[in-house]
Amino acid sequence: WAQKSVDAARAAGLVPSQVDSAFDTPITREDFCSLAAAVYRAWDRENVLQTASTGKVSFTDTDNADVLLCASAGVVNGVGNGKFAPDKNITRQEAASMLHRLGALNKNVKNDVNDRLPHVFADGEKIRSWARSDINWVYRQGIMNGTGSNHFTPDGAYTREQSIATTLRLYDSRYALAPEAEA
């Protein structure tokens, strides 16, 4: 389902080599940061970034440059006690939060939010309160959709192909393909 998105993201230079395979496997926090950092750098070249916090950030369990860039820009947070947990897989609601924070860095991306979901997912009660406004935003922007059968699956694993497709949608407001369910 995601082949066109993967091809388009590759053509735009948004798919780092470490995530350019095993597309149906869950994505780790570190690998998601590699995608987010690619978008961040592309926007920086296009001069569309808002002024972002770029304070010094460090973690005891990683010194990966993409992780540190995303953390200093406010796209991702640590997990506590100075750790990032780079090898931990992310959930769909965590991805929504990270995508929203990344989108907020682009001065051309509309960033209005509220906690009320525009669509009532059958599993909406499972969406955590901290993720509601982020899921609302990514859904309304057409960046993330449900997983089929009127579900969002907030605690479900987020795959590499889903990550590539949604970071491409966020990056390119001229995205010509209709978003599909992230099966």
Label every model-predicted segment:
Residues 135:
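Catalytic cores of secreted/periplasmic or lumenal enzymes
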